[in-house]
């Protein structure tokens, strides 16, 4: 079970099914066993590193935010929280990959999603962009479930679920155990 406001990281080697699990949680794919249930007020938003947004081409950041936040001052504060205040008048296609990633997560938040599923959100981001994303997520009051291999990003999470090459799933007690990872069976048994 995952509760409102929790930060849950899905970790493990490449190819173990972490992204597949996100797709099941987003209801993009059906589970092969078990079931996924959400509370009645849950709204799930999904972030992937694919930034194909033809609907944003030719539009300024502030215009994209104005789709949901009509008050310009509030829209600018939201852009600032995501480190995008200086890009308010910049067209979407001129943004860096990191800026597009932050704008996409901002969009998910202002659309009213209270659960964010993030697939490698810091991949291909420079340090400054990654830090801006982390800061922005600190201000998000909903639940975040993320797949990541970024240790700095993972340090802000409350819970860790590790999926092994053998398909075993472990709930890890803390970040230090998550970093050690490979000694799991003995540590969790004690």
Regions found by a protein language model. Give the residues of each.
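ABC ATP-binding cassette signature C-motif
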Residues: 1-190
